């Protein structure tokens, strides 16, 4: 519902593509950040099987959405979107570490969804 509200807040259909691309890319970057920051909660499972990304992979996964956001939406909107995703991801990561001892596939997917929802909330307030 938050995604639908975010898209419907964009009155010009051609403007919908830029936030859609940025939100999708940045929320996936948040997953890579969680994979790097949190240990696997279990030895088996998708979180452990995926492994831990190296620093270069993390830098690429985080830098590309930021550059894309600045290029497509401007620096102010980019900062608001990336900031919202960062806050949501960090809070989710802290909760996952406390509740589960680290990341699982579900934790990574939940982090992506929360980062995306946080950014769509920003889109609805800025447009």
Features from the language model and the residues they span:
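Hydrophobic alpha-helical transmembrane segments
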Residues: 1-127
